[in-house]
Structure formats: C-alpha cells, structure tokens
Amino acid sequence: PADIESLSVLKDAASCALYGNRASNGVILITTKKGTAGKLSFDLKVNQGIYTRGIKEYARTDARQFMEASWQNLRNARISAGDAPDVAARYASDNLIGEQLYLNIFNKPDKELFDANGHLADGVQMLPGYAEDLDWYKAAIRNGYRQEYLFSGNAANEKSDYYFSLGYLDEEGYVRNSSFDRLSARVSVNLTPVKWLKAGVNLSGSHQNSQITAGDQGASFANAFMYCRQIAPIYPVHLHNADGSYRLTADGKRQYDPGYYTNDQGVETATRNQYVDRHVVWENELDKNRTVRNTLQGIAYMDVKFLKDFTFTVKGDMNLSQSDNNAYNNAIIGDGKGSEGRARRETLRYKSYTFQQQLKWTHLFGPHLFDVLVAHENYSYNYDYMYGFKTAQIFPDRPNFNNFTEITSLDGYEDNYRTESYLGRIRYNYRDRYNLEVSFRRDGSSRFHPDNRWGNFGSVGANWIISEEEFMKGVRWVNNLKLRANYGQVGNDAGAGYYGYMS
C-alpha cells in the first residue's frame, strides 16, 4: 500500500466499454509511485503496534452460577417428566455430576454440593488449582504484535526518474501460534533519452509466509473464539488430580484435558460433556497450516512519437504467483485423531500476461481538439492446481507426505483462458466545455465456442462543463458544475466457465 500514489474507480458505461469484458463490474486504476524531481532521496518508515480485543466478551456465568443453573435445569426436567418437586430436587443433587457434567471441581462429594433449594451448600469451595485454569481465552489468545519497515528512495531529472522500495512486515497473530511475514520490493524506472522516445519498467515482487490456526469458520470446533465462548465455565484447560492439583506428564508438564483421563489400567473416565476429543489450545499447538507464497509482477512500456501528432505505444505486463500450502492434523487430538494423523498439500501456480499496441493521433484545430485511438490487445491466463491428502502417519509432528502411508485424495487441474481485442475511440473537445466520446471494441474469448467467440461492444458519452460558461462566471459558490450522460455495452464471459462449450 505504501507504493500506491493514487487510486481511481471507473463505473460509467463509456469508460468500462473501453476495457472490454473483464470490466463489466467496473475498473480500478492504481497508479504506483515514481521518482520526483530533485536529488536522490531516501525515506525510512517504521511502524510498531499491538493487537488487542476491541469489544468486551459477553457477560458469562461463573462456575458457581453455572452449577446452580444446571441443577435447576435438571430439577425442572424431572418435574416435567412427572416427579414431585422434592423428588426432582433430590434427583438433581444426586445425579447432576454423574449423569450430566461428569466433573466436580469443588471440595465436597458429588451428592453433597447442593442444599434443598439448589444453591451450593455452605462450605463448598473450588479446589485449589482450578480457579486459574478456567480461563480459556487466556490460554488461547494473546496480544498480537505487528512490526513493519519500509525503505524507499527516488530521484528524477529531465530525462529519467527512478523509484525503489524494500519492505518487511512481521505479525504475531492475536490467536496463539498464528503469524504472518512478508518481504516485498519494487523498482520503477522511466527514461526519455530523446524527445520522441519514452520507455519504462515497473517491477515488484513479494515472498510471504503465513501460519494460520484451525477453525476459519465460526462453527468449527477448532475456532478459538467459538470454543472459548461456548465451553462451560467449570471445565479446565488441563487435567487435575482429585485434590485439584495438576496432572503432570512424565517430563513434568501439565497435561491438557481432552474431555477424559485414562488411569493406569487403561480405563477412560469422562471429565466433561462437550468438546470431547477437541481442545482448541492443544490442537493449535500440535497442528500446522503453513502457506508460502511468491509473487512477481512486471510492467513495461515504450512510447514513440512521430509525424508530430502521432504516438505509438507498446505495453506489456506479466503476473506470476506460486503458492504452497501444507496442513497437518496431529494423531492425538482433534480432526486427525481418527485417521492416525493426516496431511494436506495444495500447490498452485498462476501466470498471466497482457500485450497491447496503441496508435494515437491528437490534433488541435483552433478551439477543436480531436483525439483518435486504435489498439490491439491480447491476454493470456494459466492456472495450475494440485491437491493431495494422506493419512496414517509413521512419525509424529512430521507433515511431509512421505511420513504418511494412506492416500485419501490426489487431484489436480489446469485452466487456460485467452482473449483478443481490437478497439477504437474518438474524443472531441471544444474549449474545455463540451466533450464527446465514441468507442467501439471487438472482443474474442476462449470461453466460447469458435463459432460464437466474438462480440462487438460500443459506447457513446458526452459532458457539458456548465461552470465554464460565461453566464456562470458570477456564481462564486460554484467552482465545478458538470452535466454528463453516457451509454455503453460491455461483454461478460465470467459465468461461462473455461470449457463450458465443450460439454
């Protein structure tokens, strides 16, 4: 964004018609920076910032409130089923933990937690160790950190201008174990060695790395925000012993709670009634979803002036992009557990180029200015995609495909798309007050059958700058008043598919 000089949006029919079928929804013109007159100068910009939550979380019940509300829910359900109120109350006190919640984080036995009215009994306190372990947001979220550096330089004289920039962006995401970094560069050079010749080139490229967490969709079990919001406030992040202390691994680390614990005899005991075998913090630590993306864009042009009023322009642009995504789901917790771990890889390559030749004639006959343009353009697009999915890992924490034994899916495809266009435009201007424009364009698209590949599109537009008229000179509160009308047609091949006519 720091390399952008200006941005314009064209939505009227006359402007869009000149750009053909790819402009059916409008045109965005982006002008990047170039060298400015003067000696070589340098600029360094440094931005530092943090990400924090801007909107507070909804008010939520705490552990004690949740227990009492759960008791009332079970008691009312039993009354609805036909139990007397006192029988339903006794049933709720005796069975709330064993039948519904599965975990008692307080210092009294399961059946002694509540009084006859469903309130936690006197002396009921949370066991030590649990209070600090019920905040899932604290375990899953952090303050994100962003640092950005941009170094640029520019210079210009009568025959040339130069601009370059080098940028680096590094972000630590708001959700733990998410990150993004990008290295980018741009070079722009414009030369006018003689009066009748001008040429230039604009090159830019970037290298990006991103690590995202699971659960992009709001309903995903691995979505940190949904998980932390919906898990009951009595369920801890880690497993605890009967006295409330943390259960530790052989190397002394706290064990995450997958919704159950396994004793020495291999018997599993449930520790919660939701998100069993899911754990947003644990999954984000073990899983990986990394994307590496490289881009290169280049634009070159040359203007040749001849016979006083004529200009011949050759333009070309190229876009290259390569992206490689590697995703890994571990075999311990979450999506990969049932398949003994799984790996996914997506690779895509994209390239396009546009080549355009323009001949322009401009001449002034007194107050009458004529501008005539004829041009030819061709565009080529190629997209190559490959997808692979494997399961059953051999070694943990190794997302490479050769570490998995079962091929679940292997697919790929390639898309090719080409257009060719011939266009013409005539502009007329009288004393900068009255303007008339007529354009015609003939487009051919590879998306259509050869017998119906070409379409003709035209436009006409006019405007009257009323504020330039003599009768408006005395109106000081109006500095620009324009009446404009236009009509045009543009093609649209976006919905046709690349090979629809072959089916």
Predicted regions span which residues?
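Residues on the lipid-exposed face of transmembrane beta-strands in outer-membrane beta-barrel proteins
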Residues: 32, 151-157, 185-191, 298-304, ...
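A generic beta-sheet turn/junction motif
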Residues: 23, 155-159, 168, 363-367, ...
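Short acidic/polar hinge/loop motifs at secondary-structure boundaries
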Residues: 1-11
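N-terminal periplasmic accessory domains that precede
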Residues: 17, 23-46, 149-151
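Transmembrane beta-strand segments that form the barrel wall of outer-membrane beta-barrel proteins
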Residues: 166-172, 436-445
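Surface-exposed loop/interface segments of Gram-negative outer-membrane beta-barrel transport/assembly proteins
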Residues: 37-132, 143, 173-178, 184, ...
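Outer-membrane beta-barrel initiation region
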Residues: 139-144, 153-157
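Transmembrane beta-barrel architecture of outer membranes
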Residues: 146-150, 180-186, 421, 455-459
